[in-house]
C-alpha cells in the first residue's frame, strides 16, 4: 500500500486506522468523510482529507484519481442496532455503497478492504469454534448486508480480478470514539456510564457470551491482511478472527 483512501474515516474503526496507517506509510493516507462528520484535531491536521460520500460513485472516483489511490478501506456502514431502525438506509450504504466502491476499484485498479462481522452468523451457526465455511443466516439487516457484501466482494474478485479482502470482526473495544449503535457496544458504553456514575441498562442478557477484540488487534488484522501475499490466500471474503469472549456479568463484577 502506498496511497490509501479510508471511507468512513471518522467512525469507530476509521478514526484509529487512519492514524495508524499514517504512522506506517509515507504516501497519501486520505481521510474520507461526509459533511457533518469532519475530521478533527490530529486526524484533520496529520494528513489529507476529502469529502467522500459512498453513495456517490463519481465522488469516490475523483478522489481516487486525485490522490493516486491504490487501496481503499471501505468502512462506511450503519452499525447493527441503527441498521435495524433504518433498514433501507443500511442497505443503501452497505450494499449500494459497496457496489460503487467495487466499480471504482474495477476501473481504476484498486485493492479493497471491506470489513465483515460476526453478524453474518445466525441461530443455526455452530457457536463453538465456528468454522470458516459455515451456515450464514443472519436475522438482522446489518448481518444481511455483511453476508451480501462478502458474496459481492468475492464475485468482483472472481469475475473482474479486483483485489478484495476482508475479515469478520467481533465486537471491538475502544476508548477513542464513543459507542455508535452496535450490538456489542455495551462493552464500551458500560464503562462510560460507570465513570459518570450513571445507571446502565444492558441490552444483552446475563450469560450471553459474545466475541470481542481490542481495537489495536483489529487494526493489526486490517493492515496485515492487505499486506499479505494473495497467492497464499485460502479465503478472501472473509476470514474469521477472534480474541476473547465474555458476558455482561463479567464486566459488571470487574467494575463493582
Model-inferred region functions:
Residues 3-24:
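N-terminal Rossmann NAD(P)H-binding glycine-rich loop of SDR-like oxidoreductase domains
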Residues 141, 145-148:
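Active-site helix of classical SDR
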Residues 154-209, 215-219, 224:
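NAD(P)-dependent short-chain dehydrogenase/reductase
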Amino acid at each position: 500500500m502506498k496511497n490509501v483512501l479510508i471511507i468512513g474515516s471518522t467512525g469507530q474503526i476509521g478514526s484509529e486506522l487512519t492514524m495508524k496507517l499514517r504512522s506506517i506509510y509515507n504516501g497519501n493516507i486520505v481521510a474520507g468523510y461526509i459533511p457533518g462528520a469532519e475530521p478533527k484535531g490530529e486526524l484533520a491536521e496529520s494528513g489529507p482529507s476529502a469529502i467522500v460520500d459512498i453513495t456517490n460513485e463519481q465522488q469516490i472516483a475523483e478522489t481516487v484519481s486525485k490522490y493516486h489511490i491504490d487501496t481503499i478501506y471501505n468502512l462506511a456502514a450503519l452499525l447493527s442496532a441503527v441498521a435495524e431502525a433504518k433498514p433501507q438506509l443500511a442497505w443503501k450504504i452497505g450494499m449500494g455503497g459497496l457496489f460503487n466502491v467495487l466499480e471504482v476499484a474495477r476501473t481504476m485498479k484498486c485493492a479493497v478492504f471491506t470489513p465483515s462481522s460476526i453478524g453474518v452468523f445466525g441461530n443455526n451457526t455452530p457457536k463453538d469454534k465456528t468454522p470458516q465455511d459455515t451456515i450464514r443466516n443472519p436475522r438482522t439487516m446489518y448481518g444481511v448486508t455483511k453476508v451480501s457484501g462478502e458474496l459481492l466482494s468475492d464475485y468482483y474478485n472472481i469475475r473482474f480480478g479486483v483485489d478484495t479482502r476482508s475479515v469478520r470482526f467481533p465486537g471491538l473495544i475502544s476508548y477513542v470514539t464513543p459507542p455508535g449503535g452496535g450490538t456489542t457496544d455495551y462493552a464500551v458504553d458500560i464503562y462510560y456510564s460507570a465513570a459518570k456514575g450513571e445507571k446502565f441498562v444492558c441490552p444483552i442478557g446475563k450469560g450471553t457470551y459474545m466475541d470481542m477484540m481490542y481495537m489495536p488487534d483489529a487494526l493489526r488484522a486490517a493492515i496485515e491482511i492487505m499486506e499479505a501475499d494473495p497467492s497464499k490466500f485460502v479465503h478472501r471474503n472473509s476470514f474469521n478472527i477472534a480474541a476473547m469472549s465474555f458476558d455482561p456479568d463479567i464486566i459488571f463484577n470487574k467494575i463493582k
